[in-house]
Amino acid sequence: MTNTRKSHPLIKIMNHSFIDLPTPSNISAWWNFGSLLGVCLGLQILTGLFLAMHYTADTTTAFSSVTHICRDVNYGWLIRYMHANGASMFFIFLYFHIGRGIYYGSYTFMDTWNIGVLLLFAVMATAFMGYVLPWGQMSFWGATVITNLLSAIPYIGPTLVEWIWGGFSVDKATLTRFFAFHFILPFIITAMVMIHLLFLHETGSNNPSGMNSDSDKIPFHPYYTIKDILGVLFMMITLMSLVMFTPDLLGDPDNYTPANPLNTPPHIKPEWYFLFAYAILRSIPNKLGGVLALVFSILILMLFPILHSSKQRSMSFRPLSQCLMWVLVANLLILTWIGGQPVEHPFITIGQLASVTYFFTILILMPSTALMENKLLKW
């Protein structure tokens, strides 16, 4: 008789995905982030569900309901800060995961890569709407600034903004619909993750060498289940250290002031994980130009498979491309720093230079360097 895990219609799917899955024997810790993102998503849905039980999506009571969660609900503070800092962990892992994909050429799995970019957009939208829910100063003004960007769209812009607001400003209707979207999107993300994995399992995983590994595969369980559990352990240690010792380290103090439409904070800025994109948005003095640059700064990821000009898939054996990869990482760190600074000299100039360098590195330097390395192979 066949083993149940190989014959049962449902368990069979799990078996082919997490147990008997043939996996390259040489994948490094950079391949841990996929499973960590899955754990993060589960954690966010779970903590979010418990927060939603006590939260009220109304402008008059939203702020005090969050305060109530922290003060009066059993372990409410823990759930709230795990959710807030869990989002930060989610984005750290997302950026590492994407960075890994760029470094090792995983973007050549076009279907997996493109659904991944769509996932990034969905997670960013979810995080933005979640940041609005506590209805603090930065929640309100962040929502006002970011939704206002849509007014730059020619002809339909102003109407579109008022349609999203559900009125003539960010108000009760906006908060209610943002809560509805923030609740439903993680489930849509979960469905997209399943499609992401479906496409990945069609081709199998990439590996650090970038070469075909069909001749050297090992079962996912127990080798990589153990490795993933170790990753989760490190993640939980980091997350719980953040939550227990410095829960507000990554937040904005302005969000502890209830939303006031009559008082604008001196520096409106998003959470740290959006700062690089915010810096690119601000570096262009034209509204529509800034919005296009903002969207394209993420959408550019979809061009990686097209821009790939090297004969080798991975950067493991391409030292010049490796240097450029780290230039890109440094560039993004500079943009993140600039996004949190006020709009004044010298930050404006640094931001503009970093924004130009970001696009120039991806669109011109990386493909041309890869072509040069192809020539060096013959030399």
From Swiss-Prot:
Binds 2 heme b groups non-covalently. Its cofactor is heme b. The chain crosses the membrane at residues 33-53, 77-98, 113-133, 178-198, 226-246, 288-308, 320-340, 347-367. This is Cytochrome b. The keyword Transmembrane helix applies. Heme 1 (or BL or b562) is low-potential and absorbs at about 562 nm, and heme 2 (or BH or b566) is high-potential and absorbs at about 566 nm. The lineage of its organism: Eukaryota, Metazoa, Chordata, Craniata, Vertebrata. GO terms for molecular function: metal ion binding; ubiquinol-cytochrome-c reductase activity. Component of the ubiquinol-cytochrome c reductase complex (complex III or cytochrome b-c1 complex) that is part of the mitochondrial respiratory chain. The b-c1 complex mediates electron transfer from ubiquinol to cytochrome c. Contributes to the generation of a proton gradient across the mitochondrial membrane that is then used for ATP synthesis. Its main location: mitochondrion. It comes from Ctenomys maulinus (Maule tuco-tuco). Belongs to the cytochrome b family. Heme b b566 binds at residues 97, 196. It is found in: Mitochondrion inner membrane. Coiled coil: none annotated. Heme b b562 binds at residues 83, 182. The keyword Electron transport applies. GO terms for cellular component: mitochondrial inner membrane; respiratory chain complex III. One of its GO terms (biological process) is mitochondrial electron transport, ubiquinol to cytochrome c. Keywords: Electron transport, Heme, Iron, Membrane, Metal-binding, Mitochondrion, Mitochondrion inner membrane, Respiratory chain, Transmembrane, Transmembrane helix, Transport, Ubiquinone. A ubiquinone binds at residue 201. The cytochrome bc1 complex contains 11 subunits: 3 respiratory subunits (MT-CYB, CYC1 and UQCRFS1), 2 core proteins (UQCRC1 and UQCRC2) and 6 low-molecular weight proteins (UQCRH/QCR6, UQCRB/QCR7, UQCRQ/QCR8, UQCR10/QCR9, UQCR11/QCR10 and a cleavage product of UQCRFS1). This cytochrome bc1 complex then forms a dimer. It is a multi-pass membrane protein.
